[in-house]
Amino acid sequence: MSEELDEEVLDGLTEVEKLYTVFHGASQEDVAYAKLFWNSLSLQPPIESRLVSSDIRQRLKVAKTPNTTNAAANQAPWSKRNEEIQQDAYLRQKQEEKQRYMEMAKNRDQIIALLKKQRDERIKKEMIAYKHKPKKGKLEEKRLAPKTLSSDVDEDQKEVQKLQ
């Protein structure tokens, strides 16, 4: 019986399969059984890696038909009133926000105008001082000059803070 199995297996194999499957030092019966085993064995991927599962629970449910035309027509009058109230509140909020931004822009313009005025006054004072500045000044005059200017700067800073 083993000889018949060997002959059937060897006859069924193609030339390529005969060349690539080599069993040296084994009996013909063992070679036939090994070839039959390796030819019948096919590795399947694990269940987790399959794209589609045969499990019924995994299938998607069928989408329901939308009935939006009836829902819009059957809308209650109180819901329309509610939408109007929400729209009014939204518009009021936008108006308040716009007004707040306008006030901030106005304050910004006032601060910029004050800073420009202070800059112009400072430049004017520097031009006057430049004309009368001695070429070689004493150290005491240099020390006293920043103190007198600092009082003007403090007043200007206080005015800017009041505007903010």
Swiss-Prot record:
Keywords: Cell projection, Cytoplasm. Residues 132-164 are annotated as: Disordered. It comes from the Eukaryota. One of its GO terms (cellular component) is cilium. GO terms for biological process: cilium assembly. Signal peptide: none annotated. It holds the Pfam family HOATZ-like. InterPro entries: HOATZ-like. It is found in: Cytoplasm; Cell projection, Cilium. The keyword Cytoplasm applies. May be required for motile ciliogenesis and flagellar genesis. PANTHER family: CILIA- AND FLAGELLA-ASSOCIATED PROTEIN HOATZ, UPF0722 PROTEIN C11ORF88. Belongs to the HOATZ family. This is Cilia- and flagella-associated protein HOATZ. It comes from Danio rerio.
